Amino acid sequence: MLIWLVELSEYFKFLNLFRYITFRTGAALFTSALIVFLFGPTIINSLRIRQGKGQPIRADGPQTHFKKAGTPTMGGLMILAGIVGASLLWADLSNVYVVATLLVTLGFGAIGFYDDYLKVTKQSHKGFSGKARLGIEFIIAGIAVYFMMRTALASGTAGSTFGSSIAFPFFKDFLINLGIMFVVFGGFVIVGAGNAVNLTDGLDGLAIVPVMIAAASFGVIAYLAGNVVFANYLQINFVPGTGELAVVLGAVIGAGLGFLWFNAPPAAIFMGDTGSLALGGTIGTVAVATKHEIVMAIIGGLFVMETLSVIIQVGFFKMTGRRVFLMAPIHHHFEKKGWTESQVVIRFWIIAVGLALLGLSTLKLR
């Protein structure tokens, strides 16, 4: 919104700063962190009073988790406030990619909020119906992908079918055009990302730091993909307008830092599905917008690993009646093996950093 003040730069030269994505990204990061820091304590106290027993703890989980009973959930409200507030101030709201990303952020956050509400009120892990939840997620994601696809098709910078095509790392000109089915593919990517982060969110600080790492990585990708000079130099696909997504991701990082202040062990609050679905959906949307869906599987490899562990566990158990892991998602498996919570969290952070660097390296390998 503040970018519109650039029109007054003829009279106030300092307003030229608002033209620069890098400046507004830093400002969004600072603003979102400040929002969470300022309003976090009030939100936490309000949720603690309203929720009473807080998030239900799994009876079959590690014994160390029972001491977390009574910790409030829905901390994603703090994160959403930071992201949306900072984005409204610093991002270009006339940009289709920004609007589509915020649509997914808020839509997935609302789904997660309802799921958290059901779990808290029923004191059960069974919240929103799985099929209904996925269906609504696909509708929201599909709408966002459709409008982003139309925008990319209209730009015509890389051919008439670029907007509906899948791009591959290492090969700039190797594209597979899916036509209208790209909406389905993009929706799958966004929904998958949202639920992958949701599965990862099981320990204090485990999900939020890898999310910030992924957000920083995709902030770089969005900035480069949206800049014709850098895109041509690196031989990556130029997608006009996606550079503005760096501002939104700056807000994600700032909100994540603010939330981590309260989520550091022992956590004063959990983000819940409200936060994890929204954050994962946001990252997934940026990946689709910048044509780096496959690279997201590398940068977000930790989330992929967590998701695969659940799929393998459930599938193998249905076929044989036995389990591959002591408990899924896989971070609980390592807890059962004797790792402390801090060991699991920090080691998974290290994995996330390594995968992010590996994913970013694909930008130069052409």
Curated annotation (Swiss-Prot):
Signal peptide: none
Pathway of action: Cell wall biogenesis; peptidoglycan biosynthesis
UniProt keywords, alphabetically: Cell cycle, Cell division, Cell inner membrane, Cell membrane, Cell shape, Cell wall biogenesis/degradation, Magnesium, Membrane, Metal-binding, Peptidoglycan synthesis, Transferase, Transmembrane, Transmembrane helix
GO terms of biological process kind: cell division; cell wall organization; peptidoglycan biosynthetic process; regulation of cell shape
Protein's cellular compartments: Cell inner membrane
Family membership noted in the UniProt record: Belongs to the glycosyltransferase 4 family. MraY subfamily.
Protein name per the record: Phospho-N-acetylmuramoyl-pentapeptide-transferase
Lineage, uppermost ranks: Bacteria, Pseudomonadati, Pseudomonadota, Alphaproteobacteria, Hyphomicrobiales
GN (gene name): mraY
